[in-house]
Amino acid sequence: MRRVIPLLCSLLLLCSCGAGPSASAPEDSSRLVIFTARSAAVYDDAVREFERRTGIWVEVRTADGTLPLLEQIAAGSSGGDLLLGAAPDSLSAYGDCFAPYTAPLAADIPDAYRDSEDRWTPFSLLPTVLIYNDQLVQRNVPDSWADLVSVAWRGRIACPDPTVSATGCTALQALLQVLPGEEEAVLTAFSRNLSGVLPSAAAVADAVADGSCYVGVTTEDLALQAADSGLSITVVYPAEGAVVQPDCAAIVRDCAHEDNARAFIDFLLSSEVQTRLARQLRRPIRGDADAALPPVLSYDPYGAGAHQAELLAIWRSLTAEDAA
């Protein structure tokens, strides 16, 4: 039976379960602990079907952002076996934390999206996009990364907190790549335009849809799902190019259930799961993954990962000054 536990509460809840597993729980060898910041819509059906087919008992531990999960894994003794849903720019900053694994179907993944050491396995493509509320914004609509620092949007932009959300961190990296000027000046201009930082990319879509913010930065799947459900959202692929990275799964080094984690990665790459991802308005990784992609920003995720700690230090300093 699958369990979903918010990560910050997981230790308390697990300690309250008693001295041993419940009667319905399997032996330890038939367990798998997944860490994820993705919405249940991404993983729920896949986890249920994986459990049904394999008999492996999956526990899903969730958090609002990918970066706290990575930090917990890096600290050691996290208890997690698999990180589900993270991009190479964030993963590469924690590369030593993950065990290489070459899945049998990895050859179907375009080389451009694979890690040279197979420390993480892509299972879908996930562009970072802009959105705006089309009831509130009907002229001079934002269509570029550069628009995010325009004074026209002062206090009206929603962005996931870059210190928590990998999507927010990617947005900062994209702005620095596209815009001229000193890093601190670019980041200052962007921070002044924010209505406030939000805990996740999903929260950005909600804030733009309800009109609390006019413009936002989020992931393509969340943006398309919001628009498809009839909310007042228009999706924009930035004129300079969208940042397109693979969404990946990575096995925690020295985890307790490595074989089960490998089996789950194999399942993610199966035709059935890849087809299901397409139905969820996500881009499957196998086959012609580049088909119908929007204009893509040339983006080096490994360089971004190497710069991540320095970037976040600057951002924390700026936002602390704004709050003072």
Descriptions of predicted regions:
Residues P88-D96, S116-P142, T170-A174, V178, ...:
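Periplasmic solute-binding protein
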Residues Q173-E240:
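Ligand-binding pocket segment of bilobal, Venus flytrap-like solute-binding proteins
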Residues L13-S16:
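C-terminal motif of bacterial Sec signal peptides marking the signal peptidase cleavage site
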Residues A107-A112, L126, L187-S191, V197-L198, ...:
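Periplasmic-binding protein-like
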Residues G18-A93:
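Early extracytoplasmic/lumenal segment of secretory-pathway proteins
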Residues V252-G303:
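Mature extracytoplasmic/periplasmic domains
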Residues S78-L83, A99-L130, A146, R156-P162:
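A structural signal for short loop-to-beta-strand junctions that line the ligand-binding cleft
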Residues Y94-T102, R114-D118, Q225-Y237:
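Ligand-binding "clamshell"
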